[in-house]
Amino acid sequence: MNHRFRSAFIAFAVGLLLTSCNNPTPKNYFDEAVLNVNLITPFGGQAALQSLAHPSVKLVPGTKDQTAPMTREEIVEDQIQRVEGSLTKIKALPDSEETRDMVQTSIKLHEFVLPVYKGEYRELAKLYDEGGSQQERVAKAQEIDRKYLAGYQALFNRLIELGKPYAAKHNIKVEWNGL
């Protein structure tokens, strides 16, 4: 009887330990829902013009030290992959009353920018890669700002409004840099 009780207790303790490992900490919630929006800032047409004007470099296949500029399409595709990955992680966070508004706002923000990256940002990248004129690129950037910048800023600002007191409450040190 004593052996059975001990085995049951150990099984219960291990189960409790394993389930507690699946509960994100406040810092996990904050990092995924708020801090990772750094991946999508700055956002908008003017920001896109600046980021695409000076493309990053990549290693030339088969070499260890030779680089070549990335196409703008590659830059946008990389951005799309990062936003999709971040969105998947945010959606996987367990629901909690304390974090619900913050997490839902972050999801809305990611879901807001994703179609813009897949649409207008790709079009802007194509203008760069295929030699579109500066006038065409500026017009596309202005279109992005006109259509999306206000919505982005509203969601972003709301997320920061929710994130600041959450970080303070849980002693998460954050450099807000004027936000």
Residue ranges and their predicted role:
Residues 29-41, 72-79, 102-112, 148-151, ...:
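Amphipathic alpha-helix face/heptad-repeat signature
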